[in-house]
């Protein structure tokens, strides 16, 4: 069953993606994001950090769809959604992991599971070393004893958790069709990296291969990053 035939996505993905097609439009999504902004501030999160992160993302020169996706984590309380399940469900319904390419070589990732582990570690702002340990070698070589077992659920700071919700929020379009072009790798862009507390290290650090994976080439061109080309 594809997304077009669904009334609404079940499971953990349903907590991130609205189930009603009529409500899946830019206006209602942004109103939902505005409502989530207020809920998060009232939930005790640091208002100054919230405003700073909002300025980093929403004042960037990015599309309205990308801007909405960056706001989505503030709509969904972390306690309501198990991130691994939501990301795995989004992967099954959109097959986005099969379309990830290496920014330098243009090759696809040969193993989806550790790539998703790296994405989740990015989304929860674990930092370079623990992200590498969680990814089973996709982002960097693991040393014995440093591999971090992924727990069933993470408790990310709302404005720092981006990728898992970004996948799910763009999994279904207004008419229910799958939108591969909207599955953007936000953490490989420098504005998003700065908002996640990693600064330019996340976008430029070469021991970390996660910075090489990018989901959408039009998004890369918008940020003036080189377009991947496959070797002859």
UniProtKB/Swiss-Prot annotation:
Residues 28-46 have a biased composition (Basic and acidic residues). Residues 1-46 are annotated as: Disordered. Keywords: Plasmid. This is Uncharacterized protein ORF7 in nfe locus. The lineage of its organism: Bacteria, Pseudomonadati, Pseudomonadota, Alphaproteobacteria, Hyphomicrobiales.
